[in-house]
Amino acid sequence: MENSMMFISRSLRRPVTALNCNLQSVRTVIYLHKGPRINGLRRDPESYLRNPSGVLFTEVNAKECQDKVRSILQLPKYGINLSNELILQCLTHKSFAHGSKPYNEKLNLLGAQFLKLQTCIHSLKNGSPAESCENGQLSLQFSNLGTKFAKELTSKNTACTFVKLHNLDPFIFWKMRDPIKDGHINGETTIFASVLNAFIGAILSTNGSEKAAKFIQGSLLDKEDLHSLVNIANENVASAKAKISDKENKAFL
């Protein structure tokens, strides 16, 4: 017993040998690929954070982007206040940057429904002058609902044309499926239409239905504006009728 205790005490008194550690610094180099996607290579964020017009998302200038958008859409005219962040969200589609940035999907859905409501009201109240008033009272034109023109007012083609005519497309952040092919194949029509609807949804959710309705009636459905949805829809309907007429004429030849 005494021998075992002596052995333990001796073992505890043994000096502890320090471990020799050699610290080495290792430098790693990460290659960030630019250009077309290649499997296994990490892409440079800058390559997918630019929109088709070359604008870098992280370097958006408020004066060059948001302020111009406010002016184009005449937001101050209706007392509408949208933050820079919300405007940028309205301009950003889900396809951009793998959906990592705030995008406009829900605002688009909200705005599309409110636009349909306002265009229905517009169609009900806008008939021919002779039919609009009966006995000095406003007559609602229910026959206007469901017409080709009424449907065209809220079509994606009409909204897309509105965005292009007002030069909003350079500010839109989205990803082209194939940069070599034209915008139609890349889904440009749907994406541009979603931006206009998103602005309506943003105005409705932050400024209220009254200002949103005034914005639609004043900026989008003004007959005096050559680039309004009303005049664009009229041109689209006339163009469609002309194409049908041409086909019928060729069929008889």
UniProtKB/Swiss-Prot annotation:
Present with 6500 molecules/cell in log phase SD medium. Disulfide bonds: none annotated. The keyword Ribosomal protein applies. GO terms for molecular function: ribonuclease III activity; structural constituent of ribosome. This is Large ribosomal subunit protein mL57. Component of the mitochondrial large ribosomal subunit (mt-LSU). Mature yeast 74S mitochondrial ribosomes consist of a small (37S) and a large (54S) subunit. The 37S small subunit contains a 15S ribosomal RNA (15S mt-rRNA) and 34 different proteins. The 54S large subunit contains a 21S rRNA (21S mt-rRNA) and 46 different proteins. mL57 forms a heterodimer with mL44 and stabilizes rRNA expansion segments 1/2 at a membrane-facing protuberance close to the point of attachment of the ribosome to the translocon in the membrane. Residues 1-28 form a transit peptide. Keywords: Mitochondrion, Ribonucleoprotein, Ribosomal protein, Transit peptide. GO terms for biological process: mitochondrial translation; RNA processing. The gene is MRPL15. It comes from Saccharomyces cerevisiae (strain ATCC 204508 / S288c). It is found in: Mitochondrion. Its main location: mitochondrion. Component of the mitochondrial ribosome (mitoribosome), a dedicated translation machinery responsible for the synthesis of mitochondrial genome-encoded proteins, including at least some of the essential transmembrane subunits of the mitochondrial respiratory chain. The mitoribosomes are attached to the mitochondrial inner membrane and translation products are cotranslationally integrated into the membrane. It holds the Pfam family Ribonucleas_3_3. Belongs to the ribonuclease III family. Mitochondrion-specific ribosomal protein mL57 subfamily. GO terms for cellular component: mitochondrial inner membrane; mitochondrial large ribosomal subunit; mitochondrion. The keyword Zinc does not apply. InterPro entries: Ribosomal_mL57 (IPR040030), RNase_III_dom (IPR000999), RNase_III_sf (IPR036389).
